[in-house]
Amino acid sequence: MSQIESQNPEPVFQLKGSMLAITVMELARTNLEALDRQLAAKVAQAPNFFSNTPLILALDKLAPNEGPVDLPGLVRICRQHGLRTLAIRANRIEDIAAAIAVDLPVLPPSGARERVIDPVEAEAPKKIPEKPPEPLIKPTRVITAPVRGGQQIYAQGGDLVVVAPVSPGAELLADGNIHVYGPMRGRALAGIKGDTKARIFCQQLSAELISIAGQYKVSEDLRRDPLWGSPVQISLSGDVLNIIRL
């Protein structure tokens, strides 16, 4: 390191905390054979959705009398189906110990909104000129052309409006709401940064997948709904997606 650099070091990294919409798998039983079969069936319905998907394994819903979890085996099965385990949630001592043994972080129940973490919090910050705050809501993104299979459209910081058909294999993502004024045959993921008040509106529900703030339903579940093929509004209550007629 040069003398000049040591006298006036510039930071080369920044630590941040964040709240992201990450898929959470809540384990109800420790039967890994059944999990492997059921997970394979889910992946077959929407293979792209499960490709390299970050995952939190939630073991805190397991009954106290449920047997021990083969955590390495569980992580291996998830990885085989495209799910990349980042951490676990657990409250049983044996599950926490198993996570520590394989060097997996154990998370608290909830996260924090993104902010810069300053390790030297005791030092009084120097006053610097503040930049004008960026608007929280960005303009609505409007798409007028058909969205074809393989296309991905993202409305960052706001809503997405599509006034054309959405083909199978196409993917719509928005931090806010999604409106589709035409047949919705692809995937629609609203509130992808954790906005649980986001909604999805479409004139014809024929989607491969719908998701709000990480809670999702695939086409196999949607086809059983009596409003399949109808104009609908989709909202989230707790961890339940509600579908009602427009």
From Swiss-Prot:
Gene3D superfamilies: 2.160.20.70, 3.30.70.260. Keywords: Cell cycle, Cell division, Septation. It holds the Pfam family MinC_N. One of its GO terms (biological process) is regulation of cell division. Interacts with MinD and FtsZ. Belongs to the MinC family. HAMAP family: MinC (MF_00267). Cell division inhibitor that blocks the formation of polar Z ring septums. Rapidly oscillates between the poles of the cell to destabilize FtsZ filaments that have formed before they mature into polar Z rings. Prevents FtsZ polymerization. This is Probable septum site-determining protein MinC. The lineage of its organism: Bacteria, Pseudomonadati, Pseudomonadota, Gammaproteobacteria, Pseudomonadales.
